[in-house]
Every structure is written in C-alpha cells, then in structure tokens.
C-alpha cells in the first residue's frame, strides 16, 4: 500500500510580538497577529508623513524533536520592503523587495525539542536600490501576508526558487487541437548522498486523469534546486477563457521513493494562446477580446494592506461590478 505525501504546511500567523526598533524597552512590545502593518491608521490620510522605519516581529515557536528527520522552511508571502530573518539570534537571510514571497531553510538553524525564537526585522524606509522608488500608493511597513512553516522530506520538490511551488508549466505550442507543455520541476536533495527517485506527473480535469507519466531521476547531494523536465501533449485541450470558461486543469507532481510518496505539489494549468495586433487589438484563443482594467490598490480602511480573506471577498465583489477582463 502506497503511503501518502509527507509535506506539512503550518500557518504561524498567531501570537507575534511587535515593537519599533527605536523602542528599546521590551515593555513597549505589543501582541499582534499576521497579516499586520504598522501603517493601518496613518497611511490612508493622503499625506506622506506616515511612519517609515524599522519594525521588529518576534515569535516563540516549539520545534518538535521528531522533526529532526524533516527539512524546515519559513515561507513569507509578503513583507515590505526589506526583511532580515533571524533564528535564535542568528541571521538566516535578507530579502529585498516588498511585493514577492520568499523562503529560507532553517533545518540546521533550529534547536529540536526546544522553544526557538524567530525575529523578523522589516524596514519600509526609502531604499534607493529597491523598486519601486515612487508610486501613487502607500509604502506600508510590516509582514502584511501569511507566514508558513513548511516541513518536507529530505528529498523534496524545492520551494527555494524564489518561493515558487517548484513546478513551472511552460506552454510551448498551443492550438485548438493540442497543447504542447513542458513541466519544469525543481528538486532538492538535503542529504549527502546521491538518491534515486521517481517523478510522477498527472494532469486532471474536473472528472478524471487526462494524462499521466513517470520519470526516474537521480537527485544530486546537497542541492537546493535541481531541474528536471517532463514534456507532454494534451489532445483537444479545453481552453481557458477568463470571462466565459475560466477552466483550469490540475497538474499533480509527486516525488516517490521505494513506493513511498515523499512530496506532492498541485499546480493549476490554464491552457490558452493569444496574440496582440497594434491595429486589431488582443486575441485570446483566436477570438478578438476587448480588454478593460482599473487601478485597484491592495488596501482597505482600518487594515491598510494587511488583508484578511474577508477583505479579498469584499474586493472581488466590487470587481464584478467593474466588468474586468483579466
């Protein structure tokens, strides 16, 4: 009997402590939950005098002893705009840029069976080497999206390539009759030995598996990102159209060793082709499509850009009244 994939994704948004860097007194810290911004109240007034500086987020997290057989990663979905991450006082890494996710591995940085301290130092001050420098929006400071603790096997689909899923689906040639796709899969071997494994790729529609294949791979020791490609063709694909038929296939990539599923990633796939003509406009799947859009910033009153799921619900409800074509 085949065992299930071992990846675990733990949301660690609750019970953080926050204070500004100039608040040296520990009593100045206050409890916050993520997502969080320190500009929720002062940035929406239309002025440029809102707080821009350094904020410190700390969290105690117990690392279970049985996790010693795993690999541990911290995934940040958004923090603005320069973030430095520390574990137990040791610097893990820096991310520069406020509008992209980032991941750091902490496997050998934590103490197992003990409480560990995370510190994230976020700076939304002006950075001349970090884009954008100006904009018609506020540069909110804080960890304004979710933070995850990822646990994987020593052999895994790598989350270390710019915090991607590790599965890239490259649409090489698309027509109404067939879709030629290349799946670029990033693997990672955290051990010191060459390991043999099997990659299984499945493409599912709403009811069944429409394509399946397997590939044997040799995983190089101590490798953060090892690229493996699997090319495949979908016959008579169901084409994606954002307004009429926003259907997406689900591509499931599984890493298997000795009959055991070590890791699994699901990646949506919207098959489509398009062209733009300077005189005739935009064509999606061979049909002319007028494009309309608006400028909608990621912010809400009282919370700034630290959006919760209910915030997205409200924003999407409003977008439907604008007849957006995405």
Question: Could you tell me what each predicted segment is?
Answer:
Residues 1-316:
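Secreted/periplasmic carbohydrate-active enzymes, especially glycoside hydrolases
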Residues 314-326:
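Single conserved hydrophobic/aromatic residue that forms the stacking wall/gate
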